[in-house]
Regions:
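N-terminal, post-signal-peptide region of Sec/Tat-exported proteins
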Residues: 49, 53-68, 72
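Electrostatic cytochrome c docking/interface patches
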Residues: 20-43, 60
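Short sequence/structural segments immediately N-terminal
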Residues: 43, 119-122
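Bacterial N-terminal signal peptides that target proteins for export
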Residues: 1-10
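Sequence/structural segment immediately N-terminal to covalent heme-attachment motifs in c-type
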Residues: 34-57, 83-89
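Extracytoplasmic electron-transfer domains, predominantly the class I c-type cytochrome c fold
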Residues: 65-119
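Bacterial N-terminal signal peptides
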Residues: 9-18
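Residues within well-ordered alpha-helical secondary structure of globular protein domains
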Residues: 12, 22, 46, 90, ...
Length: 122
């Protein structure tokens, strides 16, 4: 390895550690229990369905600007669990997607995420 490549590698590592890998390292872990898609479905039906619809495609909230995310899309399904957890927990600024951290426990958010993962298109 050349000296320049070593320096760049070290700088990249320092930046990654210094910025916390995009802020995802501080996410709460599930409490040790397996996330439950069945429980997640019940929570989804009471909280998320209004905008994201029964099938997760977002058709219930088409009147919203911007439209709700299509939870079946490869763009959503391809995201890391930690990223989706953070979105549910913290919401998305300037959209109708509010933070659910005041209403749902971390375990409940993980359960919802387990259910959302059932929307994956084959």
């Amino acid at each position: 390895m050349r000296f320049g490549e070593i320096v760049l590698s070290l700088l990249g590592g320092i930046l990654l550690v210094g910025f916390g890998g995009g802020g995802l390292k501080d996410l709460p872990a599930a409490s040790g229990k397996q996330a439950d898609a069945v429980t997640g479905r019940e929570i989804y039906s009471n909280t998320c369905i209004r905008c994201h619809g029964i099938d997760g495609k977002g058709v219930m909230g088409l009147q919203l600007v911007p439209k709700p995310a299509d939870l079946t899309s490869p763009g959503i399904q391809g995201r890391l669990d930690a990223s989706l957890f953070k979105r549910i927990h913290d919401g998305k600024p300037n959209t109708a997607m509010g933070a659910w951290s005041a209403s749902l426990s971390d375990d409940e958010i993980w359960d919802v995420l387990a259910y959302v993962r059932t929307f994956r298109q084959e």
